[in-house]
Amino acid sequence: MSKTVSQQILRLEREQARAINQGDIPGATKMFDRAFVGFSSTTHERIRGLAALAKTFQHYLDLSPRLTYRIQKPQVQVCGSTAIATFYWSVELASGKTIHGRGTHVFARRGKEWRVIHEHFSRAH
């Protein structure tokens, strides 16, 4: 079962990356739970809820209308109804500048679906 769950989580991560790269904010927030809480690599304040998350994504797109978000070397750990995805990420901006970092998504099973209840992104040092 863990392999199947891992595949589901990785599919959600790929779908989110595709949505971000297409500027599709509803698609980018689709895998997140309504009660989502997280930390961004660009602001110190905690992000709470889907509206705040959508606002954060819109801020990124306002700064660089064309960007390419990628995740590399993802790993998924499954523990019952919780799964944790850790990965390295990069964002290439329209200017050609690339930003690198690390990310964690904590997923919880909600019925038959997996939803992100927490994320933590940080830039590489």
What residue ranges belong to the model's regions?
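A beta-strand edge to alpha-helix "cap/lid" segment located at domain peripheries
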Residues: M1-K30, V37-H125
